[in-house]
Amino acid sequence: MRYIKEILKKNRIWVLVYIGLGIFNAFMANYKADYFQKVIDGLADRTLAFAGVATYGFILLVNYCMNYLDNYPEKKLEHGIYLDFKLLSLRKISTIDYTEYQKIGTGKLVQRIENGSTAGRNVLFNFWLRSIRDLLPTIGFSIYFIWKIDEKVTYVLFVGYAFIFIITNILLKFLYKIKEKILNSEELLNHYLVRGYMEMLVFRMSKQFPSEIKKTCNAKEDIVSSKVKMNMIHEAFFTIFALFVTMLDIGILFYAWKTKNLTVGSVVALIALIENAYTPIAVFNVLYVQYKLDKASYKRFEEFLGLKDDVQLRNGNAINTNVGKIAIRNLSFQYEERKIIDGLSLSIQKGEKIAFVGESGSGKSTLIKILLGLLKYNQGEVRLGDMELKEICLNNLYDRVSYLSQDAPVFDGTIKENLVFEKQVSEEQMLGALSEVQLSHLVENLAEGLNTEIGEKGTCLSGGEKQRLALARLWFEDSELVILDEATSAMDNLTEENVMKSVMQKMKDKTVIAIAHRLNSIAGFDRIILFKEGRIVGQGTFEELLHTDSYFMDLYNANVK
């Protein structure tokens, strides 16, 4: 309920307006039926005056105008609440612990957020707010006006409520099982869809699409079949309800004919008021069934929102030192049962150019993620400048660090946005940075220039172009520590050599840490650190290692081949 309360508080003014209008409209709908009784009886006994007709007309006018005005807060809340739940998910991603984030599959996460946002909107808006402002007032006013006409009919209403309650609980048992199956099938369907969209080349070349499409179709059939069953159960309830109300209407007519106690106006009013009294019950039962079913989706969404946050993003000390100086002592890191870094010690001086080299799985990228505060180490010490990493506010650290991963960190937006985000930078400066990374031709050949959209994950660019665009971002970042995790892996050798020469010239006063598999690209670095099985097994310059370290020579020879 925490997140629902948060959204209620955010929209409290419109919630109060929405509830107030709903109660007023519920009263007017029933008062209209009650006053209509007087109009009918006045016509029957010829006592109806012009004032009575005018009053009834005024009641209708007010009722219809207020119903029209009611649409504004209704739609504002309906759409706003749904999008507020989606915003909660984005805020969660901005603070979620990195290890928790790694466990989530993109397809399942997208579906969980979509289902959860819809379910959250339904729980809060369609069930609670509608019940409070529409259903309960309408039922209450209807019963009051029915009681004014005939008390005995009121007692029959209560018996009918009990009957409908029993029917609803029987139907709910079937619906719960079906809804759970639908949720699982929808997440599975979305998993296959996103996987197919994202890995098009892999599946096409391996001829896996027929198998993927078959599995997706099976999930689709399960969803369609289950939703049809749910709809039939819903419609069964409405059919039973319609038959019950019909029986009540006939009963009213029979009661009036037999007892002669009701006027024509009273009979007309009772039939209208019974409709007002029972329609909310039908709606409430459908909403209640949906509410119970939506709670399953919302629970999954809440579980995601409740995942552990990285509290160090906001907590911790502000940095008062240069983070380009790094001291690591006896560092160990274990993920589940696997020890990835084992008793590692390393010192890096301010402005030094360091390369991490080693086999896949040797701990290089893990150490980078520890230095960025993404992974929390089990034991040891990591000091940036003269401050312990665990005590630093990470948001403060990220102002001083630039990080480029192997998966080029470009996003769906324009070239300009990918270069400078929202910074105010002249076009001349941006073009200059692109020239340094040999991307001038990219802008020159595009009609929109810097405002060209590059597509999701930069799909309009080649792998090398994406990496160069990300590297050009370094020209506009005032960082003390630059980390390059195979940031040039998609470039050809000549382009890589020229681009890295420009980058290293630009970063000459900054500490640079690079992970590289193409060892020629780091030949000019001050020091190369060799990793194997989570330990440092050697270090030195390129020339020193090439002539004295057999492990480095093996890596180099494998790279050359």
Predicted regions and their residues:
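Short intracellular "coupling" helices and adjacent cytoplasmic loop segments at the cytosolic face
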Residues: 73, 79, 87-117, 192-215, ...
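Cytosolic ends of transmembrane helices, especially the final helix of ABC transmembrane type-1 domains
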Residues: 208, 232, 276-306
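An intracellular "coupling" helix at the cytosolic face of ABC transporter transmembrane type-1 domains
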Residues: 98-99, 115-128, 132, 136, ...
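Transmembrane helix-loop-helix hairpins at lipid-water interfaces of multipass membrane proteins
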Residues: 15-69, 73, 147-154, 264
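A hydrophobic transmembrane-helix motif
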Residues: 27-37, 129-172, 228-271
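A short amphipathic helical element positioned immediately N-terminal to and/or at the very start
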Residues: 1-10, 109
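Hydrophobic transmembrane alpha-helices
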Residues: 58-62, 193, 267-287
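ABC-type nucleotide-binding domain
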Residues: 321-561
